[in-house]
Amino acid sequence: RCLHAGAACSGPIQKIPCCGTCSRRKCT
């Protein structure tokens, strides 16, 4: 399970990581 592009993120360490990377508080 991971967050898709456009989802809000707080950084590399979070409960559900981004599928890609976290940039400007948004998953890319």
Curated annotation (Swiss-Prot):
Cell compartments where the protein resides: Secreted
Sequence intervals crossing the membrane: none
A GO molecular-function annotation: toxin activity
Name the record gives this protein: NU-theraphotoxin-Preg1a
Additional free-text comment from the UniProt record: Negative results: does not show activity when tested at 100 uM on mammalian sodium channels (Nav1.1, Nav1.2, Nav1.3, Nav1.4, Nav1.5, Nav1.6, Nav1.7, and Nav1.8), potassium channels (Kv1.1, Kv1.2, Kv1.3, Kv1.4, Kv1.5, Kv1.6, Kv2.1, Kv3.1, Kv4.3, Kv7.1, Kv7.3, Kv10.1, Kv11.1(hERG), GIRK1), a calcium channel (Cav3.3), and nicotinic acetylcholine receceptors alpha1-beta-1-gamma-delta and nAChR alpha-7. The letter 'N' in the name stands for the Greek letter 'nu' that has been chosen as the activity descriptor for melanocortin receptor modulators. Since it is impossible to search for Greek letters in databases, the UniProt policy is to write all Greek letters as their full names (i.e. alpha, beta, etc.).
Disulfide topology: C2-C19, C9-C22, C18-C27
Organism, scientific name: Poecilotheria regalis (Indian ornamental tree spider)
Protein keywords: Disulfide bond, G-protein coupled receptor impairing toxin, Knottin, Secreted, Toxin
Cellular component terms per the entry's GO annotation: extracellular region
Tissue specificity as recorded in UniProt: Expressed by the venom gland.
Record remark on domains: The presence of a 'disulfide through disulfide knot' structurally defines this protein as a knottin.
Role according to the record: Toxin that acts as an agonist on melanocortin receptors (MC1R, MC3R, MC5R, MC5R). After binding to MC1R, the peptide activates the hMC1R/Gs pathway, but after binding to MC4R, it is not able to activate or antagonize the MC4R/Gs pathway. Inhibits melanocyte stimulating hormone (MSH)-binding to human receptors (Ki=1.8 uM to MC1R, Ki=19.8 uM to MC3R, Ki=7.1 uM to MC4R, Ki=10.0 uM to MC5R). This toxin is structurally unrelated to the natural agonists.
Tree of life domain: Eukaryota
Chief location of this protein within or outside the cell: secreted
